[in-house]
Regions:
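Extracytoplasmic/secreted cell-surface and envelope-processing proteins
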Residues: 53-54, 110-113, 137-140, 197-200, ...
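Structured beta-strand-rich core segments of catalytic domains in phosphoester-bond hydrolases
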Residues: 48, 106-187, 191-194
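Metal-dependent phosphoester-hydrolase catalytic domains
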Residues: 219-231, 239-359
Length: 359
């Protein structure tokens, strides 16, 4: 049997399960006091860790995540991963639609369609922005947004080119411009900067390059505006908030260290204020690589769209963890550890902030 008929049969067999889950979820959340309301825009980001479809892509040499590949990535494993992700998004959004969800490590429009159109997330009216990028493995950044909350004005990708290495390829920065229901403009950037694979010091120049390119785009928005635009920058930066790329190149300052002339405020510096100690764990150490940064114009009191104080959060429900028998405490419930299939969620925790739109 070919892969496409198998897919159709699998989808039919899952439809009853998804319907029942949606009904149960609605019953469970009916009496929950949501922190979101109609004036709130929840902006979230999540590195979904290798969210691949199981089909061979003849245009790429990297096909580890296929049935015959090294990870033995089958259709049933794909659906398990997809279901884990949508349940997490429902919990993260507290039953209401997220206004913006930045994503990274998604392969293509097939996986985003199966996530947002073939699960209970469909009722939240998400639309997805995705461009095929240059990453060798085929993992991209993407944005899902609620058409009930925001209107898309434009989007584009920002390439990260290394003038010293013409063969260098990495993930794009995704930029989108929105209007909210009050016609307030919101600029969003989604990032997945070069990894530390090969050594932190050996690769730091690549993340600093990404920071320079992003800062140049932010500065161009400011030059084109009469006042500082309302900007949200999110992503897996593969650096901490206090690393040089973030603090001195991008110039994203902690709230307590910002000055009037500073444009960007990093809301994910102090773990004590975020509800959890980090977004990923390496051995015994938690770090904050996944961050959301906003413009000063959102941080200061505003008569329109503004940041809700202390809403920055690392989302850490128990179901995203397992016991860490090697280093103690908890670790993230991943899809794989090396080649060994675990059936979990991701190696990163989601993060979010809330904005308030004043009517």
């Amino acid at each position: 049997m070919s892969q496409k008929p198998k897919l159709k049969l699998y989808m039919k067999s899952k439809s009853l399960y998804l319907t029942l889950f949606a009904l149960v979820f609605q019953c469970v959340t009916f009496n929950v006091l949501y922190s979101q309301n109609e004036n709130t825009l929840r902006i979230a980001f999540w590195n979904m860790e290798n969210f691949f479809d199981p089909f061979v892509d003849s245009t790429r040499t990297y096909n580890d995540y296929t049935e015959d590949g090294s990870q033995h990535w089958t259709l049933s494993r794909f659906y398990k991963k997809r279901n884990n992700i949508y349940k997490t998004i429902l919990a993260l959004s507290e039953g209401a639609p997220l206004s913006v969800l930045g994503m990274c490590e998604v392969e293509n429009t097939f996986v985003t369609t199966m996530l947002f159109q073939e699960t209970p997330l469909k009722r939240h009216n998400y639309r997805v922005i995705h461009y095929e990028g240059d990453d060798r493995r085929g993992i991209d950044v993407a944005i899902a947004y609620s058409i009930d909350k925001l209107q898309l004005i434009s989007s584009e990708v920002i390439k990260i080119r290394n003038p010293d290495n013409k063969r260098f390829k990495t993930r794009d920065i995704l930029y989108a411009k929105f209007y909210d229901r009050q016609s307030d403009t919101l600029h969003c950037f989604v990032n997945h900067w070069p990894s530390r694979y090969g050594g932190e010091k050996e690769t730091i120049h690549l993340r600093e390059l990404a920071a320079y390119i992003l800062k140049d785009k932010v500065d161009s928005l400011i030059r084109a505006s009469d006042c500082i635009p309302k900007i949200v920058i999110m992503g897996d930066f593969n650096d901490t908030p206090l690393d040089n790329s973030m603090l001195n190149v991008l110039k994203a300052k902690p709230p307590e260290r910002r000055h009037v002339e500073d444009t960007l405020v990093n809301l994910f510096v102090n773990a004590d204020d975020l509800g959890f100690e980090g977004t990923l764990k390496h051995q015994y150490r938690w770090q904050i690589f996944d961050q959301i940064i906003i413009s000063n114009s959102l941080y200061n009191d505003s008569k329109s769209l503004r940041y809700i104080n202390k809403s920055a959060t690392i989302f850490h429900p128990d179901f995203l963890f397992v016991d860490d028998e090697t280093y103690g405490g908890k670790k993230l419930f991943r899809t794989y550890i090396g080649p060994k299939y675990q059936g979990g969620y991701s190696d990163h925790l989601p993060v979010y902030i809330d904005l308030r739109s004043t009517f």
